[in-house]
């Protein structure tokens, strides 16, 4: 049976569904920032950006951009009622101090035990860029990761052990890919959802670590 991968927007929309009311959430640079566009207006979620924003909203409409309002990825945002601005140092104190309920990060690799690599591939021509990812990986109460299931070369991004430099150890709680959702639990990598038409056997073939099928029943 054939299957269709989720688009980046569909991944973001799916993550938005799992963010509880009243949560304080940091959205990492890249795909995670799209989540802001899929949070319902009547759902109180307080989005944090490491450059010193709290309670920002989705991107503005074309022509309504304010150059003073950008997130850590230099993308335009809007501010919600009650939103606030603060010093970069205060922002990192929030990140490191356990004040964020969830952070959503991208990834180069995720290991079976929840180790995360998302700042450097080790390639000689690559420019390392850790930003606040290490602070978020250890400081947030839960870490969600959004990523393609495999690289452009078809190599698994979910692996038995990291081969890239680690961002954080045993920090990932849930993985959202274009093929499935995986919970990282003491027993291993538990697949709780997968795209329609994708067999568990095919998903396992595309994954570099052993999976547990929890999609039945």
UniProtKB/Swiss-Prot annotation:
InterPro entries per record: 3-oxoacid_CoA-transf_B (IPR012791), CoA_trans_fam_I (IPR004165), CoA_transf_AS (IPR004164), NagB/RpiA_transferase-like (IPR037171)
What's its catalytic activity? 3-oxoadipate + succinyl-CoA = 3-oxoadipyl-CoA + succinate
Known EC number: 2.8.3.6
Q: Which UniProt keywords apply?
A: Aromatic hydrocarbons catabolism, Transferase
Q: In which pathway does it act?
A: Aromatic compound metabolism; beta-ketoadipate pathway; acetyl-CoA and succinyl-CoA from 3-oxoadipate: step 1/2
Query: What is annotated as the active site?
Result: 50
Domain of life of the native organism? Bacteria
GO molecular function terms listed in the Swiss-Prot or TrEMBL record: 3-oxoadipate CoA-transferase activity
Q: Which GO biological process annotations does it have?
A: beta-ketoadipate pathway
Pfam families assigned: CoA_trans
Give a yes or no for keyword Lipid biosynthesis in this entry.
Answer: no
Question: What family is this protein classified in?
Answer: Belongs to the 3-oxoacid CoA-transferase subunit B family.
Q: How does it assemble?
A: Heterodimer.
Please identify the protein, giving its name as recorded: 3-oxoadipate CoA-transferase subunit B
Organism per entry: Acinetobacter baylyi (strain ATCC 33305 / BD413 / ADP1)
